[in-house]
Amino acid sequence: MNEKIPVFLKEIGFAPTREDRVAVMRAFERETAAAIAGAPSSLRMIDSCLPFSSVAPATSAPVIVVDAGGTNLRVAAVRFTAGGPQFSHLHRSRMPGTDGAVSADAFHAAIAAEVDAVRALEPAAAGIGYCFSYECRSLPDGDAELVAWSKQVSAPEVIGQRVGAELVRRLAGGPLPVVVLNDTVATLLAGLSCRGQECPGQIGFILGTGTNVACVEKGTVRNAESGECDKMPRSPCDVAYDATLPDTGAAPFEKMVSGAYLGGVGHELLKAAARAGLIDGSGLDGLSLSTRELDAFGAGAGDVSSPHPLAAALAPRDVPAAREIVRAVFLRAVSLTAAHLAAFVRRSAEAGRSPVRITADGSTYWKTRTVDFDGLVRREIAELVPDVPFEIVHIDEAPMVGAACGVATLAGRVRERRTA
């Protein structure tokens, strides 16, 4: 190992110490407390208007779930059984508005047609859980108004509309109860479907293309929008890569840990290492690296049997050093993620809600190969909050399972109002 590399990584901000992790944890705690108190904060703590219970809501009828969160639209039926949630009739199609602009009517009608197709197979469906992962204002009746689009969806007339009501209005089979949920809020609710010990504390966590946390505050589930936190120091590589992006300055924490950005950050770190004389960087300037490519290289790709663009851009003698540098990108993401989660674990415990279950979703968290991401995050959380019992669980299709849980929660609230 080149003894100069650890010194370089420390100096440039890619070798966080325990003190650094504690500082990030404290920053998230302060920002969360400020947001809840209505003070200025980089976190938003958006109220989902869904009441929280640590007991899984029960429904014997199937629920239709819609996942509108990216390129693909997915619709299915979900049943809760003794063995856990069971999916049927899962169908994928293109998300309306991703192949060109569409009107509001065309947008809602396309989704209604998919729901009608599943409903024809499940006529006893109790309602619709609508996982709608765009900026919305949640409403007390379970619906939500779209505030802004992202992810290259073009349906401008939908902005300002109640997306649940517009969907239901177009159902051929008549109205159904609907609850509209952010994907991270839905992931938290999915944790209620887990068998095993009861966990009064529940956290929803996503680390994939982006990152976010959902938690419980004042009896309701909140969407923290924690990727927007701006209270931790960034390295020169973070700043340099951010300057190349169309949304420079937005979501600074997210850009330090998540899959949409780690490839670019790693590229900047390798170029900085070349400027420091640690590797020959003559082949790096024209290179563009995705996070998947960076991870493949860090995990060992790039030998004769497995060619790789980064390995091809480096002199063979520099490949081991470059792998050590790439590994640091993912190890820093581990430490930042652990501190991120530890802040919400501590806050849950201090409110009397422990043990804490973290339901984690996202490919960056579960599929990174360069390091044992999940194992290292667990270890570092335990070091930061040694007195709080917690678990991290993976649930297949967590946002869709959580959307179904949201329907059951809404149904329970309606029953309570009728009997009050």
Regions found by a protein language model. Name each.
Residues A58-S60, P123-A124, G174-P175, D183, ...:
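Short, well-ordered loop/turn elements at secondary-structure boundaries
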Residues A61-D67, G127-G129, P177-V179, Q202-I206, ...:
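Short glycine-aspartate micro-motif
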Residues P85-F87, S150-G160, A186-V265, K271:
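Glycine-rich phosphate-binding loop of actin/hexokinase-like ATP-binding domains
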Residues R92-A112, C131, C136-G196, G201-I203, ...:
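Glycine-rich phosphate-binding loop and adjoining helix at the ATP-binding site
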